[in-house]
Design a protein with these regions (language model features):
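A nucleotide- and high-energy phosphate-metabolite-utilizing enzyme signature
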Residues: 1-185
Length: 185
């Protein structure tokens, strides 16, 4: 519920008035969910349920250490600071704002930006190369090389120094370590 309210955006009419209203909604959201910490166990449960139900079929997104670990962590951190209205929703911008608020230290923020960039590049590369969303890396060497070439276009050099499967494993492990630390698991 709190997360849904935070995703609201002014799109028509008096944008200034709508933005003031959304600021007030997020202040209420913060008092109800962020300040009390009530969202922490609920978000952890939701995330682990998604992993159990979808993780095997979609390990890059829903699996252990997948993109959802980042997304749910950012949702929790955003709820902690929900009194501040976020004019943008993209992941790198959310990480930047949460870091500036003091809810992420520099090394965690840098890692989350890299991990999110890597996951999104792999996801987009899979969509471009196969024509649809895939939940895991391809098993064919030719498809894996095509995907790797696409990922190299969209990521900084340090995120594609090794084959994708070798690059992925430590990102997943560190993503889950961050998630567990944040949620006290």
């Amino acid at each position: 519920e709190g997360i849904t309210y935070m995703k609201s955006r002014a799109v028509a009419g008096d944008l200034e008035r709508a933005t003031r209203f959304l600021n007030r909604v997020q202040d209420v959201d913060w008092r109800r969910w962020g300040q009390s910490g009530r969202s922490r166990p609920q978000l952890a449960q939701m995330r682990l349920r998604l992993e159990k139900e979808q993780g095997a079929a979609d390990p890059l997104t829903a699996g252990r250490g997948g993109y959802y670990d980042i997304d749910f962590a950012l949702m929790f951190l955003r709820l902690k600071g929900a009194g501040i209205f976020f004019p943008v929703l993209n992941t790198p911008a959310r990480i930047d704002v949460i870091e500036q608020m003091g809810h992420l230290d520099r090394s965690d923020a840098d890692f989350l930006r890299d991990a999110a960039t890597f996951y999104r590049a792999v996801d987009h590369g899979l969509r471009v190369s196969t024509g649809h969303a895939e939940g895991s890396l391809p098993t064919s060497d030719a498809q894996l090389e095509t995907l790797a070439a696409l990922v190299r276009r969209w990521t900084p050099d340090h995120l594609h120094n090794q084959p994708l499967d070798i690059e992925l494993a430590p990102i997943q492990a560190r993503t889950r370590e961050f998630f567990n630390r944040l949620f006290g698991l």
